[in-house]
Amino acid sequence: MSVGLPGPHSLPSSEEASNSGNASSMPAVFHPENYSCLQGSATEMLCTEAASPRPSSEDLPLQGSPDSSTSPKQKLSSPEADKGPEEEENKVLARKQKMRTVFSQAQLCALKDRFQKQKYLSLQQMQELSSILNLSYKQVKTWFQNQRMKCKRWQKNQWLKTSNGLIQKGSAPVEYPSIHCSYPQGYLVNASGSLSMWGSQTWTNPTWSSQTWTNPTWNNQTWTNPTWSSQAWTAQSWNGQPWNAAPLHNFGEDFLQPYIQLQQNSSASDLEVNLEATRESHAHFSTPQALELFLNYSVTPPGEI
């Protein structure tokens, strides 16, 4: 048997095989023969890298989501989009062609009659009416709702017409009593709101000017005293107080004028009797007791005596 010499690619010997168990702990030792193989493989790798240069990062394509602004949008095809706008038009026409309930003349008369009596019906009343007219509850309810809307619209139009007519005619504004001043004409109001003094204007109230303030209890009484009729009221001092007889004198003349005319028609004997009575009354009233009685009588109203 011929034993081959160990070459560069020969198998390891038995000693090397026995020591192979400790290869993990000991570093591998390469012989000079192995360096030639390693150098050859390294030169081949360098040549391949030089022949085909590695592309840079700029040359590599970006692996990510495409930009929405640059990349074209992909249209998703769906069966609904393929059908086109024709089917949408058909849907619109189907909505417009909604079934309308056709009422008979008898049903319309019954519904209108009930609407005039009662505009709002309860659930039970609608069910009873629908059973009588052979209609559904929804049909009766819808008819009443539409009728109420028509009635409200008609009332609104009528109100607008009447208001426009009044504006065009230019009707006079309504005068309210609270707008006018409740004070009389002579009572002027200053800018500050205070009431001024009475002016030169007179009180012109038609309700007062036509009325005469007459007291029936006083009209029936005649205040004529024959003892005072011919008495002359002269200025004299009673108890040291001066008495201004000018207004009383004028008042006495006006008051005694009809009585004096009556005396002129009387006889001379009657005149002498009256003069005598006047002297006696003058002498009687010249006393202080009579004067005090006269003053108390003049102050006290006739009804309280």
Swiss-Prot record:
SMART domains per the UniProt record, alphabetical: HOX
SUPFAM superfamilies (UniProt xref): Homeodomain-like
Biased composition, class Polar residues, residue ranges: 65-77
GO cellular component, as recorded: nucleus
Region (Sufficient for transactivation activity), start-end ranges: 198-247
Domain of life: Eukaryota
10 X repeats starting with a Trp in each unit: region residues: 198-247
Membrane-spanning intervals of the chain: none
Places the protein is found: Nucleus
Gene3D superfamilies in the record: Homeodomain-like (1.10.10.60)
Segments of this protein annotated with the region Required for DNA-binding: 123-152
Region (Disordered): 1-30, 46-95
Keywords, alphabetical: Activator, Developmental protein, DNA-binding, Homeobox, Nucleus, Repeat, Repressor, Transcription, Transcription regulation
Sequence repeat segments: 198-202, 203-207, 208-212, 213-217, 218-222, 223-227, 228-232, 233-237, 238-242, 243-247
Region described as Sufficient for strong transactivation activity: spans on this chain: 248-305
Keyword hit for Repressor: yes
Keyword DNA-binding listed: yes
Compositionally skewed regions (Low complexity) per UniProt: 13-25
GO function terms (MF aspect): DNA-binding transcription factor activity; DNA-binding transcription repressor activity, RNA polymerase II-specific; RNA polymerase II cis-regulatory region sequence-specific DNA binding
Assembly and oligomerization: Interacts with SMAD1. Interacts with SALL4. Interacts with ZNF281/ZFP281. Interacts with PCGF1. Interacts with ESRRB; reciprocally modulates their transcriptional activities. Interacts with NSD2.
Family the entry assigns: Belongs to the Nanog homeobox family.
PANTHER family: HOMEOBOX PROTEIN, HOMEOBOX PROTEIN NANOG
Described purpose of this protein according to its UniProt entry: Transcription regulator involved in inner cell mass and embryonic stem (ES) cells proliferation and self-renewal. Imposes pluripotency on ES cells and prevents their differentiation towards extraembryonic endoderm and trophectoderm lineages. Blocks bone morphogenetic protein-induced mesoderm differentiation of ES cells by physically interacting with SMAD1 and interfering with the recruitment of coactivators to the active SMAD transcriptional complexes. Acts as a transcriptional activator or repressor.
Protein name: Homeobox protein NANOG
Organism of this sequence: Mus musculus molossinus (Japanese house mouse)
